[in-house]
Amino acid sequence: MKKIIVYSVLFLMATIQNVSSQTKVLGKWKTIDDDTGAAKSIVEIYESNGKIYGKVLQILEKGKEDKVCEECKGDKKNKPIKGMVIIYGLTKNDDEWDGGKILDPKSGKEYKCVISLENENKLKVRGYVGFSLLGRTQYWTRVKE
């Protein structure tokens, strides 16, 4: 009987930790320009139907607040970047979220995507083609509310 209780408690703790780690990536994140180090936008990471998505809430670059995605394809072509979902379809895989895509609004190109927490306030976002080694990594910072 004691073993059943111990295993039940351990299972419950593992489940709570898994849910807690997933919710830690949720929230608002400030994206940083690779070249200048300046803040570019605020992206909200949210969950829908068990998958992770990211939507541009705000453009921080002066004069680009109303920019459209000129290089995008399909239904995103010439649509405002503000309000656009740029990360979609990520699922939890151990300590990462992968299996989805990220859109670079500057080039209009889509890449495979993997995200993970470096720490409570730093999100590692990697876009790549083919293998994860062939890609680019950005670090986003959590927006304090």
Label the model's feature ranges:
Residues 23-38, 138-145:
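K/E-rich alpha-helical interaction surfaces of small helical-bundle regulatory domains
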